[in-house]
Amino acid sequence: TRQTIAQLHGGSWELWNDGPDALSPQWKATGRRTLPDGEQVPVHNGPGESLSDVYDRVQQAIDQAVPLMESGHSVLFVAHAHVLRILTARWLGVDPHFARLLRLDTAHYSILSVYKGDRVIERWNC
């Protein structure tokens, strides 16, 4: 959790401000971990994506969605809230840091659309 990472980092760490690059390289590792049921799973703790990396990546998804939307289709994005908030910021054409101001709860949906030529949030956190 964010609190655990902050504690390991020395008491202060905020994903939106510090990003994954601020974390210690010693936390990066590749190996296998054992789940409570005994199953062994591969684990790769890498540097992660920066906010700008995700912001660029979601543009690719938007680029694929827009032609479908323009031809009358609906498009469904399923992802973690963090990514969906960044996608929304990109959709609106605002700074990616704006995404931290968008609350998106677990198992909720939002609708992004176009209204009078502008990309808008039609519904949020429903």
How does the language model describe each region?
Residues 1-7, 52, 67, 71-73, ...:
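Acidic, low-complexity terminal tails and accessory targeting/binding regions
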Residues 1-57, 123:
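Phosphate-handling substructures
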Residues 42, 46, 75, 100:
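Conserved short-loop catalytic and cofactor-binding motifs
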Residues 60-68:
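A generic secondary-structure signal
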Residues 63, 85-86:
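Alpha-helical elements of the RecA-like P-loop NTPase motor core of helicases
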Residues 73-82:
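Generic beta-sheet signal
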Residues 81-85, 115:
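GST superfamily/GST-like fold recognition
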